[in-house]
Every structure is written in structure tokens, then in C-alpha cells.
Amino acid sequence: MLDPRARTLLKTLIERYIADGQPVGSRTLSRYSGLELSPATIRNVMSDLEELGLVSSPHTSAGRVPTPRGYRLFVDTMLTVESPIDSDAVTRLVQTTLQAGEPQQRVVAAAASVLSNLSQFAGVVLTPRRSHVFKQIEFLRLSDKRILLIIVTPEGDVQNRMIATQRDYAPAQLTEASNYINAHFAGLSFDEVRRRLREEIDQLRGDMTALMHAAVTASTEEPDDEETVLISGERNLLEVADLSSDMARLRKLFDVFDQKTSLLQLLDVSSHAQGVQIFIGGESTLVPIDEMSVVTAPYEVNGKIVGTLGVIGPTRMAYNRVIPIVDITARLLSLTLSQQ
């Protein structure tokens, strides 16, 4: 447990390091902390903080820098979120960009772009899981034994699937099949449709049964190229010296963007929590790079969490500025998707 003097000095050190990017010495701490302490007293407190693992001393400097553990204590107990940006202006920008009535995937992609533009780091969004409940389906004949299945979800998302059939179907037969499914099964999951079809198989002609079973099977298969993590503004991080000054670190960063596995895991974890979360590199096992942090928040559709969004940036980021950007964007994305 830190005493008030140590807390003030640690908070001042981290704020100055975030602002300047340079190790912070006792003279700077004396100037900005508001405490009337001698340089010797400040150095003693810094030594205590170093023993606690909250700050460290770079070999090339007499000053100190925060450790991941120090950042964690700072964001959990010392951070005052007073955004220097105009939150009303942010709200207007997000509302202008996230247009209700647009396809869901386009709205979600726009959110990633908004996060990137506002933070000047990288914006990331875990897209909503595909709905296995449908509002309407339609069959479109493409050629002999090839049919396009068009699925409209209750959220307004449109999904397409290819079906290879054992026989050719006339357009009138496809219309008959889609009308039957929409009339009897709309609003159900495809698993429930499969169960109902087994019960009603005697009432259907054999050709219609085969087509409907093919549609249900295709509907429950996720396409291989489905994007689950959308990233915008990766190039912004090339301007961040903390991440780009080391080639091996930069290569690892873009491997993270390319593979997306670790990001998917992190965003999935944060989707099970309420509100903004901060994952700090070197402190969280979910962040693969020590110099990287991720600020996330879940978003909802009609009160149900369906995904997560966030900002990826350096550990040395202005958290008090990024947190409200993420929070406002998540709230307005939730509102936009719920109005679809």
C-alpha cells in the first residue's frame, strides 16, 4: 500500500512519461508533483517504488520509467478520465459515421475506422457472431444443380450461401420452397428447422425435402473467409516510436494483425465483462507485446452483448483520452445496431 506522497509521485511520473516519452528525473517530479520535497527525498521514494516493481531505471538515464505493474496501478486507482477532446464533437462524428439502416457489417467496419481516426492508433472490432435465426430466406437458381441461398437475419444482416444439389430445380419450385420455409419456420434457429423438418417429412414431397435439408446444412456452416476481427489504422502505429523503433518488435506487431488469433482471444474475453477494460502489455498474458496496450468495451444489440471494440496502441498512451473515445463509440454503435 503506497502512502499519499508515493502515490502522487508515481502518478506524476507516469503522466510526464506519457506526455514526453523520456525517463523522469527528480527535478521534473519536483516541478510537476506539487510536493515540496528535496531531490534526495524524491530519489528515496523512487528507490522504494523501484523495489516494489512499479518503476524501473533505464541504463542510459538517471530518470525512471513506469513498469507494466506501475501502469496497472495507475489506470486502476489513479487515472482521472477527463478527456481533453470535445466529447460532444466525438459524439457527432460517431453518429455521422455510424448510419442506421446501413448493412451491419458496414456499420461495424465504420466503427473501427472511427476509433482509428479519433485515437490516431489502430481501431479494432470483433464483429457480431453470425445469427443462426433467420427472418426470411430466398433461393436463386444460378445454373444446373447450383443454387444461391440468401438469408436475412432479424438484425437485417444478409448472408449468402452456395448450395450444390443432386438435381435441377425450376424457379417456381424454388419459390414454393422458400415460401414454405418462410411461412412455417421464420424466426426459428436452423437447428430447430432441422428438427421440425424431420417431424414433417411425410407431409413434404421428396424433392422439396432434399432442397430444404440442403438449405439448413448450408445455413449452419460458417464461410471459411468470414472476417471476425476488423482492424483499421494499423499504419498509424508506424508513427509510434515505442512500437516501431525495433524491427523485431514491429514484425511481431504486424504478425499479431495478420494472424489475429491473440486479438480474437483478448476481444472474446472482454466481451464477457461490462464497461471499458484495459489490457497492458507485459502485465496481461492476453497482450502479446510488452509495449502494447489495448483499451476495449463491449457493444450490444437490444441489450445483448454481441461483440467488442477497442483501440490498440502503445503502453505509453494517454488513457484519459482513449478511454472516453472507446466508451462513446461502443455506446453509439450499440444504439445504431439496435435501430437497424
From Swiss-Prot:
InterPro entries: GAF-like_dom_sf (IPR029016), HrcA (IPR002571), HrcA_C (IPR021153), WH-like_DNA-bd_sf (IPR036388), WH_DNA-bd_sf (IPR036390), WHTH_HrcA_DNA-bd (IPR005104), WHTH_transcript_rep_HrcA_IDD (IPR023120). One of its GO terms (biological process) is negative regulation of DNA-templated transcription. Pfam families: HrcA, HrcA_DNA-bdg. The gene is hrcA. Negative regulator of class I heat shock genes (grpE-dnaK-dnaJ and groELS operons). Prevents heat-shock induction of these operons. GO terms for molecular function: DNA binding. Belongs to the HrcA family. This is Heat-inducible transcription repressor HrcA. The keyword ATP-binding does not apply. The keyword Transcription applies. Keywords: Repressor, Stress response, Transcription, Transcription regulation.
